[in-house]
Amino acid sequence: MFTQLKRGRTAAMVFLAGMTVSASAEAQQDDRLSIHGSATIAYGKSDRLPVTGITKDGTSDYQILALQFGYKISDKDRVVTQLLHRKIGSSPLNAVTPAIDPVWAFYEHRFDNGLTVKAGRNPLPRGIFNEIRYIGTLLPLFRVGNAVYGETLEFVDGVVLRKPFDLGSDWSIDATLFGGGYDLKAQIPTSTGVSVVNTRNENTVGGQLWVNTPIDGVRVGAFANNYMSTPSATLPEAQRPNRTTTFLYSAEAVFSKAFARAEYTTFKQTKSPNFVDFSSYYVQAGVNPTEQLTLVAEYNDGRNMVRFANTPIPNLALPLNQDVALGVSYKPSAQVAFKLEGHRVEGYQFDTPVPSVIVPTAPPLVARLAPAQRTYYGLLSVAFSF
């Protein structure tokens, strides 16, 4: 099984490389064809527990490769396809991650009034980083805002409409609406261990609004999405989940020598047996002492409510991981970045089950948390793009 999986990953990388060479030759003959690629290759090692695919043994099987093809049909029309190969060390999420994932495949038309319409498999307009989080040269860390972005929600299959509005006095807004469906993959700690979620949400409608302030680089945003979990219609009515709404709030200030960002997300499903009550956030700040050097600190946190169905035991807030990260990035050019980062992780969201909830067996019937686990890990990576 391991050999077959390794061969599949190797074949995927060879396939992407072959497509790049072939497409590059064609691009030289047709200036309407554009090709962009990015890769981030890393080595990680933890001191105790496995986390985000990084083990005590260390792993170099840690990479993100993205290859994007665009074709300009006219001045107002284009098509874009992006292929993604991702390997996250020994993470349980590898089991639900394809070797090659066509994360984007859309047609785009721009109207004279500034309205843009995309149809197909579109980038999901969600938060600060969602549309660029696999381009390592644009990120201060290997991954950013892991508590909010995770390893999912890259796309929406459907339609996306975007339009900017000038409000005057240097204020403006960017408004986006979308509808369709998308995959949801996540790794969530529960009272009994680690749960890998791999579901499909359909009949979703949502939008995002960015407010750009007169201060250059400062903006605030909000994202909302109402969706139906599947299966639904094929289930007995009493078992069908309610529609769920998820929210994301963002704030960003980026200047020439410093930056600060924060995002918070939450969603809730109150109907049994699909009870979910989840929230998480991150804050990030950094400085750029020189054009090539970036120093960054980031804190991620969140919680998942544990419900003890059919018992008098009250719900319990199960913390996720409190992740404190410090990193340094050196960019000799805009296309290359070398990064070194260290993380202190404390909580219950690891790649192997850890004791989390102590269920009461006698009065008082109040559950309590087991002692939180802690581990440290480091990542050394190189990112390049073209």
Language-model segments: residues:
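Short, small-residue-rich loop/turn micro-motifs
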Residues: A39-K45, L83-H85, P123, N226, ...
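Outer-membrane beta-barrel pore domains
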Residues: P50-T55, N94, A105-R110, N130-Y134, ...
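Bacterial N-terminal signal peptides that target proteins for export
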Residues: F2-A12
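Small-residue packing motifs within transmembrane alpha-helices
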Residues: M13-V14, G217
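Outer membrane beta-barrel
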Residues: Q29-I35, A42, K56-L184, W210-D216, ...
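Outer-membrane beta-barrel biogenesis signature
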Residues: V14-G58, T230, P332-V336, A383
